[in-house]
């Protein structure tokens, strides 16, 4: 079995991102688009400010926003959204 190549920080001096950070950012974009189809944008903006104030501009904040939006969309769909694709 061969060893995985060693990771090196970017040459421009920017800090290394966590593994999976690209996935978190892409998932947040996708769930945000879906949430905008179902919720008032003002509500989503207020939620974003709230989470940003608690977690700052971090991956932890992005993960928290994903979890919150997933829960909200799940409840919304279970309550009988007319545009639901899941039931």
Curated annotation (Swiss-Prot):
Subcellular localization(s) per the UniProt record: Virion; Host nucleus
Modified residues (Phosphoserine): 84
Matching Pfam families: VPR
InterPro entries for the chain: RetroV_VpR/X
One term under GO cellular component: virion component
GO BP term (any one): symbiont entry into host cell
Domain of life: Viruses
Keywords attached to this entry: Activator, AIDS, Cell cycle, Host G2/M cell cycle arrest by virus, Host nucleus, Host-virus interaction, Modulation of host cell cycle by virus, Phosphoprotein, Transcription, Transcription regulation, Viral penetration into host nucleus, Virion, Virus entry into host cell
Other notes: This isolate is from a German AIDS patient (with predominantly neurological complications) who was probably infected in Mali.
Protein function: Stimulates gene expression driven by the HIV-2 LTR. Prevents infected cells from undergoing mitosis and proliferating, by inducing arrest or delay in the G2 phase of the cell cycle. Cell cycle arrest creates a favorable environment for maximizing viral expression and production.
Subunit and partners: Interacts with human UNG.
Name of the protein described by the UniProt record: Protein Vpr
Species of the source: Human immunodeficiency virus type 2 subtype A (isolate BEN)
């Amino acid at each position: 079995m061969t060893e995985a190549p060693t990771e090196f920080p970017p040459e421009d001096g920017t800090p290394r991102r966590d593994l999976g950070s690209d996935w978190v950012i892409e998932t947040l974009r996708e769930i945000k688009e879906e949430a905008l189809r179902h919720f008032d944008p003002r509500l989503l903006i207020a939620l974003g400010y709230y989470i940003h104030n608690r977690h700052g501009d971090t991956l932890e904040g992005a993960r928290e926003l994903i979890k919150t939006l997933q829960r909200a969309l799940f409840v919304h769909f279970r309550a009988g959204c007319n545009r639901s694709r899941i039931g």
